[in-house]
Amino acid sequence: ISYAIDQGINFIDCANIYGTMDNRANIGQSEIILGRAIKNRRDNLVITSKVCSSIGSGANDSGLSRYHILREIDRSLKRLGTDHVDIYLIHAPDDRTPLAETLRAMDDIVRSGKARYVGCCNFPAWKVCQSLWVADQLGVDSIVGIQNPYSLLNRRLELEMFDLLTEMELGMMAYSPLAVGLLSGIYQPSQNPPIGSYWAQHLDQFTKQMQANEGQVIETLIKLAQEISKTPAQLAQAWILSRPEVTVFISGSDSISHIEDNIGAVGWKIDSQIMKELDEVSASFAT
């Protein structure tokens, strides 16, 4: 984390549910680790956290009720060692709780100074539109941006969401830009996934995807990246940043080399012919 900040990265995404080693038994640990890393550097960073996911078996241990939201923001701030997050995100829709109750609670958090802005994750376009309308009717702080998956292998946001983002001037945080590593260059359709990797543990699904359109996208990405002396991960993520609707992509890094690879996705533009090839080969994932 410190190395990433030293290289100029200033946006770090977190959540109350995130633990270590993807183990939900360790929930909250990511915020604790992040809090230690950003100590004395907080003012130069944009930090997010999230609320909704289950953090226990109790009746108030999940969802978007006022009780859960107000309790979890305090817990997140304590773990992060800060008095505010820059964007507090609704992690997922909660059909059990009235949207008005959720938005009022989020507004209270902004008014109290515990968050600067409010956003949402994993909402379809109609739900974002509904949230904007309800917030307007209530006269409360509205969402300023969304966080949804977007990549060469998942372009569904282009159907409705992108037009909404442009019209309402909302920010877009694209997560899973490498499609769980499929676009990283580590995986190739003609080869078995590396032993111990995520897709080696999901071999049947991997094989099925590589025989479909995913395999063609990956082969094209690798070929084009080689032609311009970039890595597949850099090209895949630069393609995301080329979209005017996208504000930032969120990419996980397990090592300094991964951080350096991700940083190599910014600061340059993709040639129009390469853009055309990537758009065409991945067109089926925009439907």
Where are the regions a protein language model picked out?
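Short, acidic/polar
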Residues: I1-A4, L64-L80, V128-W133
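N-terminal binding-site loop/beta-alpha segment at the start of enzyme catalytic domains
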Residues: I1-L45, T287
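Acidic (Asp/Glu)-rich catalytic clusters
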Residues: I5-D6, G35-V46, L77-G81, V110, ...
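Glycine-centered flexible beta-alpha turn that most often forms the glycine-rich phosphate-binding loop
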Residues: I12, V85, V118
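A short acidic, helix-capping loop that chelates divalent metal ions and anchors anionic groups
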Residues: Y18-D22, S54-N60, H258
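Active-site mouth loops of central-metabolism enzymes
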Residues: I55-L70, H91-T97
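Active-site groove signature of glycoside hydrolases
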Residues: L77-T97
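Beta/alpha (TIM)-barrel catalytic core signal, keyed to glycine-rich beta->alpha loops juxtaposed to Asp/Glu
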Residues: P93, T97-A286
